[in-house]
Amino acid sequence: MSMPALFKDRLSIPVIASPLFIISQPDLVIAQCRAGVVGSFPSLNARPSGTFEQWLQKLSSELTDKDAPFAVNLIVHSTNPRLEEDLALCVKYKVP
């Protein structure tokens, strides 16, 4: 199986950094991506909810095509009132 184009020449090792509750935030994700691993965070770490779009703006503006991609952990449980809004923002910002 070959490496998908999104990862080719962008990863130093094939690792996804754990999306740590409360701990993971844009600066950590940017550092992870620049180190050559997939940076990730739970969308619910962005509080209040309007903060999530600011986080995606920061990631989109500071990461380049040479950095590893990032991932958003969306909580799809029925008790998450932000799911639809957060998913729409992921689509808007073309989260890899």
List each language-model region with its residue ranges.
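Active-site entrance/lid segments in N-terminal catalytic domains of soluble metabolic enzymes
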Residues: 1-96
